[in-house]
């Protein structure tokens, strides 16, 4: 496809004596036996100094190796060509669960190229603002496969891969602030022909949508936030503790599968295409961007567009009751739904209910 530049669309102690003298308040062993050190004690100190030298040399060598091998890239990237191939195999397998896109777009932004898929909705939808789907972290557009039928029955759909995350989008400039996060997404919306969009974000995609609406709301017609993290409540302590080991790519794959199953309410994920894609993203891609911080309630109160918040009653990510309460108290034009018994994988568990609630929300 041709390329438009700008926000454009294309179609990837110093001496030996000082060290041996005791410090203040330390009794010298030599002094206790008449001021003379026995040959045995001298040999012991000599051996001890030798051990210290060996340890110091090992620490220095390890530090040098770390300095040589450490990852200094300022942008998100796959760790190797083989890792990229492994992820893309899983990504393309998961994409086969999606309908065929009408168009595949690569949108040039100030921070990199963003992969966008467009899916045609019913012909009679006319000028209705389309959905723009924002996936969770370490996944990609295919995470919405279970939701596409219910959404496409209502209007056209765009789905993208988040910039700085594993997927088909390619980051080429550092994303350093939450304003940067909003800027690249705003540039994507500006490059698309529609006047406005209903942003539908899942998990970190929900935070990404709300963050855009806080910083650059011009093209945001509405927000649909499904289990958004760091938006209405902070992350749970258990989540933070469980996520530490799975953030190390060379730890066993089974640990990442167990973590992903835990977030999905115990459902097995290793045999699902989307589950394999997410695990591959966790183990092959290094992210380089600021961690999302909690959106302050006073900023939520500035949102003037309609907002639908869907919270999982059994979410392991946050306190669901507290999240629902924050949304109800601070959204000026908010509709809050809590799904009892649902896990963080709510979009795949209850796609029909989500589609029906979205249709009712947009009809009001």
What does each model-found stretch correspond to?
Residues 2-6, 10-130, 154, 363-364:
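Alpha/beta-hydrolase fold catalytic core
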Residues 119-167:
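Conserved HGGG/HGGXW glycine-rich cap/lid loop of the alpha/beta-hydrolase fold
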Residues 159-198:
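Active-site loop/oxyanion-hole signature of alpha/beta-hydrolase fold enzymes
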Residues 201, 205, 209:
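Gly/Ala-rich beta-loop-alpha elbow adjacent to hydrolase catalytic centers
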Residues 214, 222-250:
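Flexible "cap/lid" loop of the alpha/beta hydrolase fold
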Residues 234-240, 249-304:
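Conserved alpha/beta-hydrolase catalytic His-Asp/Glu region
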Residues 310-342:
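Conserved loop-alpha-helix segment in the C-terminal half of the alpha/beta-hydrolase fold
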Residues 342-351:
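Catalytic histidine-centered segment of alpha/beta-hydrolase-like enzymes
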């Amino acid at each position: 496809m041709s390329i438009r530049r700008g926000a454009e669309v294309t179609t990837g102690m110093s001496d030996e004596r000082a060290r041996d003298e005791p410090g203040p308040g330390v009794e010298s062993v030599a002094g206790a036996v008449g001021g003379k050190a026995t040959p045995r004690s001298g040999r012991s100190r000599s051996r001890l100094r030798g051990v210290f030298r060996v340890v110091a040399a090992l620490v220095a060598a390890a530090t040098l190796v770390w300095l040589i091998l450490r990852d200094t890239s300022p942008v998100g990237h796959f760790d190797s060509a083989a890792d990229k191939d492994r992820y893309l195999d899983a990504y393309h397998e998961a994409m086969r669960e999606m309908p065929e896109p009408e168009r595949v777009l690569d949108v040039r932004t100030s921070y990199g190229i963003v992969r966008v898929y467009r899916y045609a909705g019913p012909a009679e939808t006319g000028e209705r603002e389309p959905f723009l789907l924002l996936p969770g972290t370490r996944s990609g557009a295919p995470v919405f496969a279970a939701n596409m039928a219910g959404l496409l029955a209502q209007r056209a759909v765009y789905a993208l891969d988040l910039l700085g995350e594993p997927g088909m989008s390619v980051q080429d400039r550092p994303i350093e602030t939450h304003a940067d996060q909003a800027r690249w997404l705003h540039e994507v919306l500006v490059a698309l022909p529609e006047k406005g969009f209903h942003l539908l974000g899942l998990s970190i995609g929900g935070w990404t949508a709300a963050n855009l609406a806080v910083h650059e709301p011009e093209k945001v017609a509405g927000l649909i936030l499904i289990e958004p993290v760091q938006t209405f409540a902070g992350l749970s302590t258990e989540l933070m503790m469980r996520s530490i080991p799975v953030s190390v790519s060379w730890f066993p794959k089974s640990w990442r599968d167990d973590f992903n199953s835990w977030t999905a309410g115990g459902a097995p994920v290793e045999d699902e295409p989307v589950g394999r894609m997410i695990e591959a993203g966790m183990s092959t891609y290094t992210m380089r961007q600021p961690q999302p911080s909690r959106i302050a309630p006073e900023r939520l109160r500035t949102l003037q567009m309609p907002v639908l918040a869907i919270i999982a009653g059994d979410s392991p990510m946050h306190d669901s009751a507290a999240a629902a309460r924050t949304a109800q108290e601070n959204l000026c034009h908010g509709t809050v739904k809590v799904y009892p018994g649902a896990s963080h994988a709510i979009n795949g568990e209850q796609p029909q209910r989500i589609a029906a609630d979205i249709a009712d929300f947009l009809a009001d």
